[in-house]
Amino acid sequence: MALRRLSKSVSSAIKAQYTLSRPSPLLRSRSLSSSPHYTSIGRPTNSFIGKINNSSITHATTTHGQLFPLSSPRRFCTTTAQVNQNEFTEMAWEGLINAFDAARESKQQIVESEHLMKALLEQKDGMARKIFTKAGIDNSSVLQATDLFISKQPTVSDASGQRLGSSLSVILENAKRHKKDMLDSYVSVEHFLLAYYSDTRFGQEFFRDMKLDIQVLKDAIKDVRGDQRVTDRNPESKYQALEKYGNDLTEMARRGKLDPVIGRDDEIRRCIQILCRRTKNNPVIIGEPGVGKTAIAEGLAQRIVRGDVPEPLMNRKLISLDMGSLLAGAKFRGDFEERLKAVMKEVSASNGQTILFIDEIHTVVGAGAMDGAMDASNLLKPMLGRGELRCIGATTLTEYRKYIEKDPALERRFQQVLCVQPSVEDTISILRGLRERYELHHGVTISDSALVSAAVLADRYITERFLPDKAIDLVDEAGAKLKMEITSKPTELDGIDRAVIKLEMEKLSLKNDTDKASKERLQKIENDLSTLKQKQKELNVQWEKEKSLMTKIRSFKEEIDRVNLEIESAEREYDLNRAAELKYGTLLSLQRQLEEAEKNLTNFRQFGQSLLREVVTDLDIAEIVSKWTGIPLSNLQQSEREKLVMLEEVLHHRVIGQDMAVKSVADAIRRSRAGLSDPNRPIASFMFMGPTGVGKTELAKALAGYLFNTENAIVRVDMSEYMEKHSVSRLVGAPPGYVGYEEGGQLTEVVRRRPYSVVLFDEIEKAHPDVFNILLQLLDDGRITDSQGRTVSFKNCVVIMTSNIGSHHILETLRNNEDSKEAVYEIMKRQVVELARQNFRPEFMNRIDEYIVFQPLDSNEISKIVELQMRRVKNSLEQKKIKLQYTKEAVDLLAQLGFDPNYGARPVKRVIQQMVENEIAVGILKGDFAEEDTVLVDVDHLASDNKLVIKKLESNASAEEMAA
């Protein structure tokens, strides 16, 4: 039944008058003229107060319990009980209104006390349910008994004209009496429950059957209400405030719900020391996200449960306050403050037995403050300063500086406990302590090598997060991945299932064919199906057996974990008989069963290949890191080993010539993949110098293509865009107050999202000198701090800078020197590097790993480049289903036309575009070349100037035949 809110303008005038057709003994015992609750019936004006059973309710009276509007004719009436909605709490009034609905659903006209009880019990999170639970009464049995009583009452076919029963009238009057006795301002649900002891129709016999004494009920009400009084229409929000808005960490530790806390002894001891102070006994744990601030509070809770704390903290409760729950649902001004005051009152009333833990404590600054109201921090300050409220806070360094330090009055009430990131060795210890929990959750076994690998790889490659959180996440995700594989169908079995389905479909399509070939194919399919189905059956049996054995092992481990918790609980309570029975009886039996199940699984796997894998290894951890960062960290397979050894050949597929440059780059990659490079610097840093068009940028693209299987993974920064002083800041981000501050730097943002990449600074000599100040830190420490203070790691990048400095020296040296190629290269390199030293500052040059000088291309290398470009044209035409063939003479002619030592290989591309691609494009548009045609590129030997000729190749003729 919907209960409509009253508008403020008419709420003060809302009343419902009920005429009692048969006054109760309680009413008869009073003088009607002197009772303030009764008045003779007048004719008050109608005021809308809500709806009952979809009928509008106004000021009304009842004749024999029937509700009538006051304006309607009344045949008789005796007395009138005035019931004002504003005298009831929201939950009590809602229960009263819903009682009419309960009666209507039961097809009963008279609304009695049992209908009110049913309505109160059906309220979600209602007070009646909480009180009965505290009294040790099962709510479902109470509701069942109420329904049984209601079902025995007479029913009518039409329950629209509902009447108010005398028993409910008695409940209403007695509830008001209990309200006065308890010094409350409003009638609440607990007053209704106490009034049932005066109800001779239903309540007295009902509570007697439930064996619920009135004193037990009063004690339960006191437990739920505490010291709170009903002073507003929504008092339930202040009852059991700590239980409603907090989580008891000590109780969770007692039940084994918290993860074990390894280490952090100094921080926990410091917190205990601060908590034992007389005033300002409030530690605040400060540290980066993920270093274990909340774990310190959980570790303290576990110590309290074990009794491993000083006397002032023995048997204390540590409650984690949920600020979100405090704020949620606080619709009106003052609701939040009342809830928080109720929490503080409960903590203060516990006389130091309760310690609050507020995670993300910076949220209390400004929480609940609106329209000039005080925020939560101002409500907490007085009690924090006097030592009446012991509170542990936790927040990050940034948020502490941003929120807490700006309020000195709040800051001085807290004592800082700094929580630093643990070392890799400490992280490994933490992971070993957590291993059992994650093994139990995922049903897998986690090897020690996986834990070590998680700590080491997380520290090196996941740079923007902190230990131990990132290492724990790696182990958790690797366990989840393996669990997914265990619960899913094995790859081998899944492949067979798909093959069977494919053959079944093929069999159906061939079933009606009568030719010999189809029958032979059908027979072959049936034979294959028979073999596959037999193998499928065997694998299914093996899979189910393996899965059942692994499930049994997991259930034994869970049972052992539960028994260990019971042993700890018994030892804490000094129930030594129970502890001995569990430890030397139940636990030993379970351990024997676990060993037997593990032995059965091992024996089963000895007879065939295992379909399921249950051990998380360092390979799994490396695979997860690779997926997170894009860094290829999985163990080197034999194919990749061979590929690394032959890396020069791989790069030479795209870069023609430049043997010295390719070898230097390949050596750097091999060092990195073998784990020999300096972990605190970029993988390698090169300066490529040489004439234009000799392959400097192409080598960088080829390297990116090898590392990522796509050359788009290269981070290319064209330094000609950074020639002005004001443009330099774009690399790391605009300073505060400038446009683009929130967007970050054009270099740093890309590398943050793709930490393993080839960073190419193209034409570095064109950059403004201030750019080199930024590059110094990048080349030396492998990191840059952007404009927002974030540290961006370049430790997994290959940094390449290209420059055209000294290109004229290179050309002159090659023209005028007759020595060997190696000797000429050394002379040329010395000259170019010396020229670079004159153009760049010494501190910049000193940080580059290697200077690589590219040589001009000769005619043979240009011919190879022509072949590369022609293969590119051929691949483009194949997409249009047109084949391309070319003769050696055509390649030589194109190389001759495109060769210019001063410009490198770029003229080749222009020549091929003009003489080959343009002609073929015109032929396609004219219709000379269509699909399935073969286009021949050849030299016209009959012409005096050996022109290039492009024509359609006749079928069954090769390029060599046409050339002949």
UniProtKB/Swiss-Prot annotation:
It holds the Pfam family AAA. Residues 164-227 are annotated as: Repeat 2. ATP binds at residues 287-294, 690-697. Residues 88-153 are annotated as: Repeat 1. CDD domains: AAA, RecA-like_ClpB_Hsp104-like. Molecular chaperone that does not seem to be involved in heat stress response or tolerance. This is Chaperone protein ClpB4, mitochondrial.
